[in-house]
Regions:
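A structural signal for multi-pass alpha-helical bundles of membrane permease subunits
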Residues: 1-223
């Protein structure tokens, strides 16, 4: 999810900054609207559109593109609800990365791109050796915070799945729960406070160590 959000936002920023794109201000309105709407409203809207009684599943069944048992959000759905969660997370997060990358790219030195073109570098090589290192240098802390936020993204599956169901094979959880959702169930629903606290400490230790290693190893810290 972090990879999709980051490079999706960076790709949109590069697209909007391209000289061949016209009406740039008009196209920027659409991600701005996705960013401005509160996330829980967006998630409830996606829940309505993709539930069994929603318009998207209904149209797919009406057009005979899927069978009558097809479902995306239900108590036994697994990969469909996970893919929908990835899509919703990207819908909510990509605009913020796009705005951040747009501001960073506006400070890029055009002389280095001109020199690269004179040396025969194509567009992909310019992106790989000039744009990407330049943006990564400034956004490494943002990547770390986005990675941690995805671990704690409680609202994605809490608002997407309409009912609180437990699936066999999972301990007080279902197939779409993140760790934060699972800890919520353990503490609030099942009153297993000791287990929830232990899992919270383990998750915190993992994220703290990972973030420290990545940040210390990044060029942003070394320079």
């Amino acid at each position: 999810s972090t990879f999709i959000n980051y490079f999706g936002g960076l790709g949109l920023a590069l697209l909007y900054n391209a000289k061949c794109v016209k009406w740039k201000r008009v196209w920027r309105i659409f991600p701005m609207l996705a960013y401005a709407i509160p996330s829980f409203i967006t998630l409830r809207a996606f829940n309505f559109m993709f539930c069994d009684a929603g318009p998207i599943v209904g149209l797919l069944k009406e057009w005979k593109w899927v069978d009558s048992n097809f479902t995306i959000i239900s108590f036994d759905s697994k990969w469909s609800i996970r893919l929908l969660g990835f899509f919703c997370c990207a819908w909510i997060s990509i605009p913020s990365i796009m705005f951040l990358s747009t501001g960073i790219l506006s400070n890029a030195n055009n002389d280095m791109y001109e020199a690269a073109r004179l040396d025969g570098a194509n567009g992909f090589q310019q992106f790989l050796y000039l744009t990407l290192p330049f943006v990564l240098f400034a956004t490494t802390p943002i990547i770390i915070s986005t990675f941690i936020a995805n671990f704690n993204n409680f609202s994605i599956f809490y608002f997407l799945r309409p009912e609180e169901t437990l699936v066999s094979g999972y301990f007080n959880a279902n197939s779409a729960d993140l760790l934060i959702n699972w800890m919520y169930r353990l503490t609030v629903d099942k009153k297993l406070y000791a287990l929830g606290s232990a899992l919270s400490l383990i998750l915190f230790a993992f994220m703290a160590i990972f973030s420290l290693i990545v940040y210390v190893s990044s060029p942003a810290y070394k320079k």
